[in-house]
């Protein structure tokens, strides 16, 4: 039962963040460790915290896109019974790099804590070049290192 729950949680987050990527010009990093601070200049930064909350930093290129994305995230969290916290917080980073950001925290609680925290992995989406910086931030992950090497060869 825990395995099914974990699979569902992973699928939900994968689908949610994958869809979110369509609103931005960036891609997604896959991680199973906390990334310090959602400070990616462009892209999506996702991290699973020790308390089974998931931090997602999404950068989009207009405030209207940010509003649309925010509504969509609220619907997704409701449908999949995930708690979306701090979802109304807009991070205006337009002065720095011309993008607007949303900081959202999803809470996915494990029903049986003896199995440890859930690991949420997110697929990398295109365009590739926009996510290289994000991948480099997460290079401690062996999977990220391998993907980065593949994409560098393709570029």
Task: Describe the function of each predicted region.
Residues 1-50:
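Charge-rich, low-complexity segments
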Residues 41-155:
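Long beta-strand-rich cores associated with HINT superfamily self-processing modules
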């Amino acid at each position: 039962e825990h395995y099914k729950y974990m699979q569902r949680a992973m699928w939900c987050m994968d689908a949610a963040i994958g869809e979110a990527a369509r609103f931005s010009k960036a891609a997604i990093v896959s991680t199973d460790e906390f990334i310090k601070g959602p400070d990616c200049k462009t892209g999506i930064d996702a991290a699973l915290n020790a308390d089974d909350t998931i931090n997602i930093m999404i950068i989009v290129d207009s405030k209207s896109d940010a509003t649309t994305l925010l509504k969509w995230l609220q619907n997704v969290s409701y449908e999949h019974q995930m708690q979306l916290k701090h979802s109304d917080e807009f991070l205006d980073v337009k002065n720095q790099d011309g993008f607007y950001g949303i900081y959202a925290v999803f809470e996915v609680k494990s029903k049986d804590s003896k199995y440890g925290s859930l690991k949420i992995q997110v697929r990398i989406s295109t365009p590739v070049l926009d996510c290289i910086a994000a991948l480099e931030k997460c290079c401690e992950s062996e999977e990220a290192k391998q993907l980065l090497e593949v994409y560098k060869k393709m570029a």
